[in-house]
Amino acid sequence: PIHDQAGKNLDNLADAVYKVLEELAISEYILCAHSLSGILACKLLKKPIKCQALVAIEPTTKNVMFADFSENPYPEMEEQMRLIEECGPELYFKNLTQETFSPETNKEIWKIMQEKRSELENQDSGFQISGEITEEDFENVSIESHVPVFIFCQAYREKEYRESEYWTSNTKLILGGNHHYLQWSESEKIATIILELSE
């Protein structure tokens, strides 16, 4: 079930994930993170259990999270946001999943989405679907250079990541795709890297 995240922050979430790893007696793992969970991944990397590598899919950077786009325009991102606003989030995502998945998989995805939506609709008012994320969450965030980092991102975000908290001497960028959900369109490339790291 979905739990209320009111009063929770990223440190609480990192502690909860770490507790699960401990309870499962995981001694090392490959961490795969998308979007906002990228900053959560950075916090998990500080924990004692060894992370073999971070595979980050368009992880959120401080520069974008707290950017003033009126002063620093990001045309490609603005265009994607315009599309979402124009057709609505649900239609935008339906178009993306239809382009990416087989009809059977697409149907299953939207069945699960509907179940989660129904679960959310039955919650009390004031229910929070995600924890608070503040600028402080990005303070003192860095990744040790011994951890290999693979960042999947759209080509226009290359400079952003090279200047970000995810960049080390051991970071590799894999450019591709034309939307934020690269785990869908670039899944084979992502799986290949994870399999190679697992060997």
Placement of each model-derived feature along the sequence:
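Accessory cap/linker subdomain of secreted extracellular hydrolases
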Residues: 75-111
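Flexible "cap/lid" loop of the alpha/beta hydrolase fold
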Residues: 55-87
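Short, hydrophobic alpha-helix immediately C-terminal to the catalytic nucleophile
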Residues: 18, 42-46, 191-195
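Conserved serine/cysteine hydrolase catalytic core
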Residues: 102-177
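Catalytic histidine-centered segment of alpha/beta-hydrolase-like enzymes
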Residues: 178-187
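Active-site loop/oxyanion-hole signature of alpha/beta-hydrolase fold enzymes
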Residues: 1-30
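Conserved hydrolase catalytic core segment
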Residues: 27-68
